[in-house]
């Protein structure tokens, strides 16, 4: 199957935005003729991938819920937060790493991610 064709088909049903998660490979955002690839956050040590996708989705939806408007820019930013939170989730078994996170940890990794993807 082809992810672009899949996204176009889903958008044909009336969906404005489509996000396809690709595990450690990040995600793809589709909007009109825009395809926005977002890489996963690279980690040297991955302990357990269980829950990474749920962490991605929770962070993405949480970020969007904190904003007054939903537009392409806020959705791109929400995907970045999703990738970052998914990267924390895989660092320990279960909720271990997520339970010990601080806002400073998240902010630091978000800045690392922004630096990594900007060119």
Ranges and model annotations:
Residues 1-119:
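Conserved phosphate-binding/catalytic region of the ribokinase-like
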